[in-house]
């Protein structure tokens, strides 16, 4: 039986040079009979896991690749599929299969940004790299990334966030770990609270986006809300090397338009049915039975319906609001495909974060969840308190106390694993991303209970003021709080000091292994899983802040771990890199509290002091942007 390094070496080549495959495929008579149901989506077409037919074919291919009993049979079948199915569809379905097959445990996927660099790097930059490689084929090539806009567009101030390679890769990877059409019966593996996680992960991205807007002197975003409104323009500056066509730009002033597969009124109807559901406090399943939207399962049920996923209780009635919204926005310039143009970046999980409309659309989706949350009772002091524990003080340790500096840091991306430049030498691009200085938390806690307490430490960060400089009221601020960390801590009687480094955050991914590292045999730990590689990029943990220093509030809360842990005790999570966003391997989601607790429900208070219990703390911190590293 092949070892993990041997399997890694066999799988890597299947991801290389996918942008250079030809459209010609072998005759169907020569295909493995198990591939009979795939190959419908033409090669050279942009694959979208939001599109119902694309996702259906990808699910068929995944099941074909998941079924072989031996690794060798799986690998041979994947090699055959690679040359007959759509390039993007293959990368998606093959990735889902690799990270879920038991015999691929320990195998690490190469970074999607190296597999399809054309989804992450502006076409002007790739064009420059091609010229340099042609002119100097005997040397390694390094080019600088080209700008995609200018100050005439206010949104360009946020290009560093929207176009961040790690953030876009995270979004692609999350949808690979949590496929919309996941079949728990077929695989025997359940994705616990998948619908609620869909809601929470995207809510957090919207909160982070608004924090970045405030950091750049912009107002908070205006949610999408009207299916007939004229939308802002956007130009992605990306060209698909699979099709040779640009990702569609969107001129300002266009509205959503009917597609050949679906009309705008269908999506409006789905929205209305979902809104009716939470007002009535129940949804209708396929047999027309009422399913109650209770506090424990309501968000999970709604998440499956809104996305929609295979867990939807009634997809035929509630439709697929989120997914078709992505498709409609991506095809606004060519809704009926009469011009045979590529869709826009909203069609692809690895590119959609680049478009400002992504955040407005997801804030619209999040508002539906918030309407449901408003039907639940607000948390009381008894719900929030942890008797016997009192937070004495909280401090952020960096070069200056309670002040963290951010900056732009240069990084490099290898293009030549995904693109054929006609040279054996390496071709790289240099780009900048936001980063921050190392920092840690010191939390002093008094345990007056006389016994050992197991606590869940929850750390959030939110802006203190709005765009006008007014202090945010708690009900506004709660939707802007971003989760920084959540971890278990044992607290003895008396005074305890908790020290926690920011690099230990459970929302960020520790390391992304490159093609070269994987080829050299650098592997993740043996107990690593797909969940270890899923997570928000570490360098984007905190917002940019301002040159003068922007005021934020650090919220720390202690809750009872013996109640929070679904195992009921101090159980170990096998893979704990980014459990808040990505869950845990073969276990229940490792926190019984609602995701985002205690900020998931509206509150009627006007000041934080009205609800702060002894086990909570609010500390003013400053984030200062200092430019390039």
From Swiss-Prot:
A Pfam family matched in the record: Hemocyanin_C
Key words, A-Z = Copper, Disulfide bond, Glycoprotein, Metal-binding, Oxygen transport, Secreted, Transport
Family designation: Belongs to the tyrosinase family. Hemocyanin subfamily.
Give the sugar-modified residues: 447, 506, 615
Q: What is this protein called?
A: Hemocyanin G chain
GO cellular component terms, A-Z: extracellular region
- The species is Aphonopelma sp. (American tarantula)
Q: What function is annotated for this protein? A: Hemocyanins are copper-containing oxygen carriers occurring freely dissolved in the hemolymph of many mollusks and arthropods.
- The answer to whether UniProt assigns keyword GTP-binding to this entry is no
InterPro entries the record matches: Di-copper_centre_dom_sf (IPR008922), Hemocyanin/hexamerin (IPR013788), Hemocyanin/hexamerin_mid_dom (IPR000896), Hemocyanin_C (IPR005203), Hemocyanin_C_sf (IPR037020), Hemocyanin_N (IPR005204), Hemocyanin_N_sf (IPR036697), Ig_E-set (IPR014756)
Q: Note the coiled coil stretches, chain numbering.
A: none
Q: What are the binding positions for Cu cation 1 in this chain?
A: 171, 175, 202
Cite the record's tissue specificity text: Hemolymph.
Q: Where does the source fall among the domains of life?
A: Eukaryota
Record's subcellular location:
Secreted, Extracellular space
Which terms does the record give in the GO molecular function aspect?
chloride ion binding; copper ion binding; oxidoreductase activity; oxygen carrier activity
Q: Which PROSITE patterns match?
A: HEMOCYANIN_1, HEMOCYANIN_2, TYROSINASE_2
Q: What is its main location?
A: secreted
Q: What else is known?
A: The two copper ions bound each have 3 nitrogen ligands (presumably contributed by His residues) and share a bridging ligand (possibly contributed by a Tyr residue) in addition to binding oxygen.
Question: Where is Cu cation 2 bound in this sequence?
Answer: 322, 326, 362
Q: How does it assemble?
A: Tarantula hemocyanin is a 24-chain polymer with seven different chains identified.
């Amino acid at each position: 039986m092949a070892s993990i390094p041997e399997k890694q070496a066999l799988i890597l080549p299947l991801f290389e040079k996918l942008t250079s495959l030809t459209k010609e495929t072998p005759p169907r008579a020569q295909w493995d009979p198990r591939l009979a149901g795939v190959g419908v989506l033409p090669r050279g077409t942009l694959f979208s896991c939001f599109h119902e037919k694309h996702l259906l074919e990808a699910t068929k291919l995944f099941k074909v690749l998941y079924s072989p009993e031996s690794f060798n049979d799986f690998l041979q079948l994947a090699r055959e599929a690679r040359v007959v199915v759509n390039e993007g569809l293959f990368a998606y379905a093959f990735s889902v299969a690799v990270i879920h097959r038991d015999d691929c445990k320990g195998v690490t996927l190469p970074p999607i940004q190296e597999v399809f660099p054309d989804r992450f790097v502006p076409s002007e930059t790739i064009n420059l790299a091609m010229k340099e490689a042609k002119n100097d084929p005997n040397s390694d090539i390094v080019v600088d990334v080209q700008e995609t806009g200018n100050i005439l567009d206010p949104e360009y101030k946020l290009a560093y966030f929207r176009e961040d390679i790690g953030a876009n890769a995270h979004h692609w990877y999350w949808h690979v770990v949590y496929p919309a059409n996941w079949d728990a019966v077929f695989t025997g593996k359940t994705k616990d609270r998948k619908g609620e996680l869909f809601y929470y992960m995207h809510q957090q991205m919207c909160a982070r986006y608004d924090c970045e807007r405030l950091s750049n002197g912009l107002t908070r975003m205006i949610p999408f809300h009207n299916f007939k409104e004229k939308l802002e323009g956007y130009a992605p500056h990306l060209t698909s090397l699979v099709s040779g066509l640009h990702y569609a730009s969107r001129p300002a002033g266009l509205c959503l338009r009917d597609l050949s597969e679906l009309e705008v009124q269908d999506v409006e109807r789905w929205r209305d049915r979902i809104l009716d559901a939470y007002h009535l406090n129940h949804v209708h399943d396929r047999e027309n039975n009422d399913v109650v939207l209770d506090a424990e399962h309501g968000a999970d049920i709604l998440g499956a319906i809104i996305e929609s996923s295979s867990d939807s209780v009634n997809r035929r009635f509630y439709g697929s609001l989120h997914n078709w919204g992505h498709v409609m926005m991506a095809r606004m310039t060519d809704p009926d495909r009469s011009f045979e143009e590529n869709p826009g970046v909203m069609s692809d999980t690895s590119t959609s974060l680049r478009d400002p409309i992504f955040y407005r659309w997801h804030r619209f989706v999040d508002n539906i969840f918030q309407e449901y949350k408003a039907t639940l009772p607000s948390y009381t002091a008894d719900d929030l308190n942890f008797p016997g524990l009192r937070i004495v003080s909280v401090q952020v340790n960096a070069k200056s106390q309670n002040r963290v500096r951010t900056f732009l840091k240069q990084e490099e991306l290898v293009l030549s694993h995904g693109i054929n430049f006609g040279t054996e030498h390496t071709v790289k691009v240099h780009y900048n991303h936001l980063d921050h200085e190392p920092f840690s938390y010191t939390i002093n806690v008094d345990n007056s209970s006389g016994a050992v307490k197991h606590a869940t430490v929850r750390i959030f960060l939110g802006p203190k003021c709005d765009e006008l400089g007014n202090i945010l009221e708690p009900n506004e601020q709660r939707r802007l709080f971003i989760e920084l960390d959540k971890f278990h801590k044992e607290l003895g009687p008396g005074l305890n000091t908790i020290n926690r480094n920011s690099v230990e955050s459970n929302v960020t991914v520790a390391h992304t292994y490159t093609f070269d590292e994987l080829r050299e045999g650098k592997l993740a730990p043996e107990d690593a899983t797909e969940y270890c590689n899923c997570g928000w990029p570490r360098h984007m943990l905190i917002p940019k802040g301002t040159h003068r220093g922007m005021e934020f509030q650090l919220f720390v809360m202690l809750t009872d771990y013996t109640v929070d842990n679904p195992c009921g005790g101090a159980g170990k999570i096998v893979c704990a890199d980014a459990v808040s966003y990505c869950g845990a391997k073969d276990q229940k989601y490792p926190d019984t509290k609602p995701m985002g607790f205690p900020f998931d429900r509206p509150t009627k208070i006007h000041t934080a002091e009205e609800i702060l219990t002894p086990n909570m703390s609010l500390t003013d911190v400053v984030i200062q942007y200092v430019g390039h590293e």
